[in-house]
Amino acid sequence: MNPENWLLLRRVVRFGDTDAAGVMHFHQLFRWCHESWEESLESYGLNPADIFPGSRKSEVTPEVALPIIHCQADFRRPIHTGDALAMELRPERLNPNSFQVHFEFRCEEQIAAHALIRHLAINAQTRHRCALPEGIDRWLEASGVGKIGSI
């Protein structure tokens, strides 16, 4: 399986994604990051019900939660309604219980924005750190960046 199938996604900016000035509002970029991460996991073959609580198809609540502990974004140029964006995800394992995903948004071959979202694995009951879920581990390894680094 080719990582490009789940790490390079495309999307068109809709009117509802923009503000009164006609450009993407900053919070929409973070929503797109999270949605593209979810889409990436699904394209890789993971069932969202196994990762995210509250899914209709979930028979049990996942034992591990993955809260966002850090996020940042930089806009390099305005993103307008109708812009076709290519979104590249670059996941990076930080240690056995955390990872981050770098996002690059391109419009007409120019970088329009960068973002980063960092997740920490915690036991959903105790709220203490724990190992990443097996599916996330597999996704990180298959994405070709599964080496443990420093935070």
UniProtKB/Swiss-Prot annotation:
Substrates-to-products reaction catalysed: 1,4-dihydroxy-2-naphthoyl-CoA + H2O = 1,4-dihydroxy-2-naphthoate + CoA + H(+)
EC class of the enzyme, as a word: hydrolase
InterPro entries for this protein: DHNA_CoA_hydrolase, HotDog_dom_sf
Any one Gene Ontology molecular-function term assigned to this protein's record: 1,4-dihydroxy-2-naphthoyl-CoA thioesterase activity
GO biological process, one term: phylloquinone biosynthetic process
Active site: 19
SUPFAM superfamilies: Thioesterase/thiol ester dehydrase-isomerase
One protein family per Pfam: 4HBT_2
Pathway the protein takes part in: Cofactor biosynthesis; phylloquinone biosynthesis; Quinol/quinone metabolism; 1,4-dihydroxy-2-naphthoate biosynthesis; 1,4-dihydroxy-2-naphthoate from chorismate: step 7/7
Keywords annotated in UniProt: Hydrolase
Keyword Hydrolase: yes
Gene3D superfamilies xrefs: Hotdog Thioesterase
UniProt EC number: 3.1.2.28
Function field: Catalyzes the hydrolysis of 1,4-dihydroxy-2-naphthoyl-CoA (DHNA-CoA) to 1,4-dihydroxy-2-naphthoate (DHNA), a reaction involved in phylloquinone (vitamin K1) biosynthesis.
Similarity comment: Belongs to the 4-hydroxybenzoyl-CoA thioesterase family. DHNA-CoA hydrolase subfamily.
Name of the protein this chain belongs to: 1,4-dihydroxy-2-naphthoyl-CoA hydrolase
